[in-house]
Amino acid sequence: MSYHDSSDGLLSDHLRYDTRVFPNTRAVTNALLENGLLTQARLILLDSPLMVATAFTALSFQSFTNQHEQGPEKAFQLSWWFWLLMTGLGLGTTVSIKWVGLFTIAWVGSLTLVQLWVLLGDTKNVTPRLWAKHFMARAFALIIIPVGFYMAMFAIHFLCLVNPGDGDGFMSSEFQSTLNSKGMQDVAADVAFGSRVSIRHVNTQGGYLHSHPLMYPTGSKQQQITLYPHKDENNLWLLENQTQPLGINGEQINGTQAWDNLPEPVFIKDGDVVRLYHTPTFRRLHSHDVRPPVTEADWQNEVSAYGYEGFEGDANDLFKIEIVKQKSLSPVSKERLRTIETKFRLVHVMTGCVLFSHKVKLPEWASEQQEVTCARGGTLPNSLWYVEYNEHPQLTGDNVEKVNYRNPGFFGKFWELQKVMWKTNAGLVESHAWDSRPGAWPLLKRGINFWGRDNRQIYLLGNPVVWWSSTLAVVVYVLFKGIATLRWQRNCNDYANTTFKRFDYEIGTAVLGWAFHYFPFYLMDRQLFLHHYFPALYFAVMAFCSTFDFATARISLGGIRNNPVINRVSAVAFLALTIVAFVLFSPLAYGNPWTKAECNRIKVLGSWDFDCNAFHDNVSNIDAFIPGRGMPERGL
């Protein structure tokens, strides 16, 4: 994988060069000497393939644009179709790697709309039928192909990844049931008194109501109740009536097996009061007016397992079944308790609180399992439960109705995974030691510490020459465009000049790409890092290259426009400056030996928080470096 990412880094530079060949740029080499891209390419991270896909998409669309600009009569030829289809393939690849590809789609889409608008106004050469043909071709290539490719990647994903793993807890029970060893046998549909059941939480990735022979260290110090994400015998509960059943002779039948001896099962209905007996530890689900050990809110009560073998229980063991009809699947499941189909709440009879769980982890004394409380409030999804496993001696055989999870199919799994991905990304809101906000990215105010060991450090930081020159190019273009617009309003005929018009379009499209890949991050509250700026940096570098070419082609000051020697010298000087910066900062990219003095010498900004004290005092203290030793395996 590391070799693959390194190859991606080289390939993205090659594609970037090919993209800029069209305006005959002389400064593309700065992309080859970008320390931040190099650092990412050396680690197993998504950003290197993302940059390859972004560069390929930009190259393909630029090539298609060149075909398009040859005129309507050149449309629909083989090369026209090739580059249009390659653009669609690039968009599909980009968005399949990271959702940042949606910004690339927006960039291509906006420029495509401009093309269609211009064609619509060309009534002399473009008939309505021909325009519709252009529209349909672009819709197929730039919408159908990317969407199809994106969905195909998930189809391959589902075919290859058929075993459960650490991440399957994020998915619904229906999704998990399609994984190997996660499926279950058909179980009895109706739930009766005496059923041995496992109860799952609807929200928070569906953990099981669980208990184990460990006590709370505070509060009542009774046995813990938690939410546990895996199947386990400690998830099994026996559903008892609030009173013991009566036999045929009218006498009370005692014991936890009493309901097995009835002539026929008694189904549990909406409003019935039950007790939940934990069969492995002989205790019952219990709640009382005691604060929980972690969430010590007044509206939360502790939930515990209380009692011992042979103990008849007390009133605090009683819970009422409250079926939530709008969440239950079938008409029958709205009236009585049904496996999987019925969604219900467990209301504590004595206090009126509702069995509740949320994404709060208990400490190590509870194996960091999820907290379960009894809440007088809280959101409905966090108090919803359903029965997954259901066993009863009188509900066996082929004549008993059975149920199982429905197979969600490809589209159901695909859509659920999109929602989980969105929710997981949006949930990354906690502060991180190395995060940064978008306002700091264009000026390279802060990097990311990836790894440090043995007086060496890998710290993601871009080449300042590349970053600051590309940011300057964006600022210069904005000022240039503002002045050009004012001159155009005063009837100055700048756009009659072909060179002026051409470079305005080329620089403008690059700056537009930068804007699409940069400004949306201001709307995000999640954790953000410097590497999120890389796609925008790609377009900013393209803007700088075009700006450099435009300046050398248009500026007559000092004979620059007519003197190729000056042009070459300026290009070589910039290249030399870029190389010097690359070499100076390369120890941070490669994790090479370094000294404190060398580190402090290149620390231009105080906000660059790589630790110079981690390096040796002088060269004589640097021992032989073992490549790859202790290298990081984590990403951001």
Name each region found by the language model.
Residues 105-115, 535-538:
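Hydrophobic transmembrane alpha-helices of multi-pass, membrane-embedded glycosylation machinery
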Residues 158-416:
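Lectin-like carbohydrate-binding module/patch detector with strong preference for beta-trefoil
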Residues 433-436, 448-506:
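Membrane-interface anchor segments at the N-terminal boundary of transmembrane helices
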Residues 39-50, 97-100:
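Short acidic/glycine- and proline-prone juxtamembrane loop motifs at membrane-interface regions
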Residues 49-76, 90, 104, 115, ...:
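Specific aromatic-rich, kink-prone transmembrane helix
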Residues 1-35, 51, 71-82:
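Transmembrane-helix signature of polytopic, membrane-embedded enzymes
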Residues 14, 41, 75-78, 82-98:
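Membrane-interface alpha helices of multi-pass inner-membrane proteins
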Residues 22-24, 66-68, 78, 83, ...:
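Transmembrane helical bundles and short interhelical boundary loops of multi-pass, membrane-embedded
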